[in-house]
Amino acid sequence: VPFVFSRIAVAVLLVLGAVAGPAASFAAEPVAARPADPLPPADSTQAAQAAQAAPVPCAPPPAGASLTLAQVRLDAMRCNPTIIAARRGVEASQADVQIASQRPNPVLSLGVENINPHAGVGSGNLRSKTVDSTLRVDQVIETANKGNLRVDAARKASAAAGEVVQAVVAQQTGVAEQAFFEALVSQERVAVLRETLALYERTRQASETRLKAGDVARADVTKLQLDALRAQNDMRQAITDHYRDKAMLAQAMGVPGTLADNRLVADWPALDAAVPQPDADTLQRRPDVTAAEARLAAAAASRDLARAGRVPDVTVGAQAEHYPTSPTNSYGSGNSFGVFVSIPLFVRHRNGGEARRAEVDYYAALDDRNRVLLEAGNEIDRLRSQLETARQSLRQMRDEVLPAAESVASSAEFAYSKGATGVLDLLDARRALRQTRLDATEAQGEYAKALSAYRVALQTSTTTGAPVASQARP
């Protein structure tokens, strides 16, 4: 009898080993060697976009190469880590859709019972042994349309992730443009100070010649030298600031290095550049607004799913049982079958906490949508006013202030060369011209940044048929 019992145990172990063997080998297989479950694109257009989205190593521009604003935008869209993280979020949300579409798997149960070592299990083959063997399959049946609601919530969350990508792209490319113009301003500042130093060098040579001739005093030459030293110190600080600004630009682009060997191309916008006018739908189609709307729609779908959780799921099962009789066991029933239904009893709770949390999340998403909508409208008005102020300041600087400062400096240079004025008047005129040129460069940068920020604020989502969560029922 023990021998027979051991044979039965060995047979059961062999069956379990046959079932567990492939699973164990699959689990032991290296992750890199297993192909990932593909997420089939919805159409050929998405397949082409997925092929074009192959990762390309992000590298800084070659040393000595010029860097344009267009190249900055392209590198930022390709290499900016925040944009990359947002795109990973879209991929994760697509996987969530696949997960949500998976229905519960059936459960197979195999069992052997009523094994009596003392009475024995009878003679004959395994099928004739007087043991009660059971084969059972159970399947969970989701009620209240939970499966479709779960897929709907996942799809709306995926749509929200897509809108978030567009909002992040608009924001981060705008940050890169701001960093580009900031670095360009510091580059122009270095150029202005370099021209000033060249002027001081020419004046020094002329002053030494006049000093030898006795036309100027030694004190005047010393004053010129001191002012030139101050200008040199200003230029060193400007160079340091320019390197810092280019390093910040590289960080905004997402490329390694500091762009120390790259010169920026002065892509200044024209003073009369066309400024887009917002229409009635611009605010509603901004990427951050559409992202908030999509998050609200996803929260509404999740709330519906949580409400459906109050209805219990049903588990149905079918069982086949084999319990033969023998001279030592007359209680066998032969082959018998059975069906089962299992329903959880909502005695202690009805998943009310989940439903309440989903309700709170919905209203939090609604508040966030309203906040984003309000801030977007205020931002457009504020940036419009800021742009007009920067445009007027730059026009005044170009048309009035800078020509006047250049005229005064030119007159002072001429008068000093003829001995009609002293060195202090010359230095005052030069300081005024230098500061005016620096202010003009700053005004140019402020106008460029204001125009860039305003254009970013007016960007609209390119997604067609974006969900309108404001229509979700309360």
Label each region the model flagged:
Residues 131-137, 335-341:
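Hydrophobic, lipid-facing positions within transmembrane beta-strands of outer-membrane proteins
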Residues 168-285, 386, 390, 450:
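Periplasmic alpha-helical coiled-coil/stalk elements that build and connect Gram-negative outer-membrane
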Residues 1-7, 12-13, 24-46, 439-474:
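Acidic, low-complexity, intrinsically disordered peripheral segments
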Residues 26-112, 131, 140-141, 149, ...:
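Bacterial Sec-pathway N-terminal export signals of envelope proteins
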Residues 151-155, 218-227, 423-431:
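Short, charged, amphipathic alpha-helical segments
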Residues 84, 107-128, 141-167, 187-189, ...:
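Small/polar (Gly/Ser/Thr/Ala-rich) solvent-exposed segments
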Residues 85-100, 168, 172-195, 202, ...:
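Amphipathic alpha-helical coiled-coil segments
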